[in-house]
């Protein structure tokens, strides 16, 4: 249950940093 997983569509598979990159 990663808090960043809810922010991005990446999912719990990627890290908070990776999510930010993917979202952008």
From Swiss-Prot:
Residues 1-24 are annotated as: Disordered. Residues 1-10 have a biased composition (Low complexity). It comes from the Eukaryota. This is Planta-induced rust protein 11. It comes from Uromyces fabae. The lineage of its organism: Eukaryota, Fungi, Dikarya, Basidiomycota, Pucciniomycotina. The gene is PIG11.
């Amino acid at each position: 249950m990663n808090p960043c997983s809810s922010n991005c569509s990446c999912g719990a598979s990627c890290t908070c940093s990776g999510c930010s990159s993917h979202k952008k």
